[in-house]
Amino acid sequence: MGQRLVVHKCDSEGHEVTSYEGMVVANDEHGLTLRARWAQGTCDVGLFALEEGDTFLETYYFHRWWNAFEVRSAAGRLRGWYCNIARPPRLVGRDLYWDDLALDLIIVPAGQVQVVDDDEFRALRLDEREPEAYAQALQALAEVQALAAGHRPPFAALDGMLDGSPAGAGLGG
């Protein structure tokens, strides 16, 4: 692995919001996982805060409507997961594009789960404009909640297996 990618986070209509580099640590037909550093200062996301220097292990699935970022402090302590409900990503050469649908899920190692930005999701009016995308987003939210509740990858560290190995490696189906 070790390939550098540029990640392009786009809004729900495909317009780029931000971009940054990451290093691929796993890649197969199901998706890819990359490592990136948070460089945007402190940001309170609900159940935890993102801090300058935090490491993200970002898992993107090519056929799922969500992605998951395992967030660790600069010292390696697991803060939790930030999950984006999003259209499946597009890999174009060394560029990864994903369209954020605003709805997010925050999960902490103790198992607490918080849905955030549901007001922004409703404001997109996907239920009226794109009923299929709306249904996929709600299904993705339920899928992530079930995976977290079952301590299944990429949330296996909820079982207390904090050995430092990447939870997103071995993407599976």
Please place each PLM-identified region on the residue numbering.
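A hydrophobic, small-residue-rich beta->alpha segment in the mid-to-C-terminal subdomain
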Residues: 101-145
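A short, polar/proline- and glycine-enriched secondary-structure boundary/capping micro-motif
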Residues: 43-49, 93-94, 124-128
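Short acidic-glycine loop/turn motifs at beta-strand connectors
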Residues: 27-30, 74-76, 108-112
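Phosphate/ribose-recognition catalytic cores of enzymes acting on nucleotide-derived substrates
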Residues: 48-90, 96, 100-103
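Charge-rich, low-complexity N-terminal segments
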Residues: 1-55
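Extended soluble regions of mature proteins
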Residues: 59, 68, 79, 95-101, ...
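Cysteine/selenocysteine-centered motifs that mediate thiol-based redox chemistry or coordinate metal-sulfur cofactors
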Residues: 142-173
